[in-house]
Amino acid sequence: MQSFPHRRPYEITSDKRLLSCPSPYSFGSFLSEWIETLKKLEATDATTIVPGHGPVEHDKEYIKLVRSLLDSTTSQVQQAVQAGLSLDDTRKKVDLESFRKQFAGDSPTLNADFQEGVVDPAVKRAYPEAKEGKLHDED
């Protein structure tokens, strides 16, 4: 992130892994680090956020929504791991339906995109961290 402290507070973020509209793609992401980055962004006094992809944001509602999605994903994956579920069973158990509606609405294309670009890779990335307590740099 780059801050410009003079005049009006801005934050310029990098690529779509931080913010992307309508769905935040999670391929190759470290969800715990992503959550921490979003928390830092939320804590700034920025009134304008310029992501590398997606529209300019003039409030932090989308950031909060993405963080909530990631928090829910990691929490559900952690619970599944604690219950001894495999990755395949965890994929079936994680329920992000309320987020699907917020990000994809009724669009079949956006719903498929949400499943394939957000849910599936996010669960895959969160599982080894929940199971082993460390990040994995492979997809």
Describe each PLM feature range.
Residues M1-Q76:
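Metallo-beta-lactamase
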Residues A43-D45, V56-D139:
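Accessory terminal helices/loops
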